[in-house]
Swiss-Prot record:
Highest taxon, organism lineage: Bacteria
Subcellular location(s) of the protein: Cell inner membrane
GO biological process, one term: cellular detoxification of fluoride
Homology family: Belongs to the fluoride channel Fluc/FEX (TC 1.A.43) family.
Role of this protein: Fluoride-specific ion channel. Important for reducing fluoride concentration in the cell, thus reducing its toxicity.
The name this protein goes by in its record: Fluoride-specific ion channel FluC
A Pfam family the protein falls into: CRCB
PANTHER family: FLUORIDE EXPORT PROTEIN 1-RELATED (PTHR28259:SF1)
InterPro entries named among the record's database cross-references: FluC
Keyword Thylakoid: no
A GO MF term: metal ion binding
Bilayer topology term: Multi-pass membrane protein
Organism: Paraburkholderia xenovorans (strain LB400)
GO cellular component, as recorded: plasma membrane
Length: 126
């Protein structure tokens, strides 16, 4: 149990720090879309696809690694709450079309990247 707590905690701390770094480096580049939030979600989508498929193919890997990568690292990196706050800000600003576009872009890209992550493992496993 303690190893699981450490795995999630350390992974979450590292993922959150990486998300913070992406926000600092990318959010100021384009005022219409916070690119740091977008990058965090898209990267997390891809890595979680790779991780889910990889761990499914290697069940002998200790469950703490799954907790570290998926629950901790990618949980800390991906940011549904920040994404939600940014969309609500667009709605409050009366930018309904922009808010809808942001939803489609974030969710669509994250799903596509997760599928690509799973496909990557499938292709590399042949």
């Amino acid at each position: 149990m303690y190893w699981s707590i450490l795995a999630v905690g350390i992974g979450g701390a590292l993922g959150s720090l990486f998300r913070w770094f992406l926000g600092i480096r990318l959010n100021g580049l384009f005022s219409g879309l916070p690119l740091g939030t977008f990058a965090a979600n898209v990267i997390a989508g891809y890595v979680i696809g790779v991780a889910v498929a990889g761990f499914a193919r290697a069940p002998q890997i200790a469950p703490e690694w799954r907790l570290f990568v998926i629950t901790g690292l990618m949980g800390g990196l991906s940011t549904f709450s920040t994404f939600s706050a940014e969309v609500v800000q667009r709605l409050q600003d009366g930018r309904l079309g922009w808010a809808a576009g942001e939803i489609v872009i974030h969710v669509g890209a994250s799903l596509v990247m997760t599928i690509l992550g799973i496909a990557t493992v499938s292709l590399l496993s042949r």
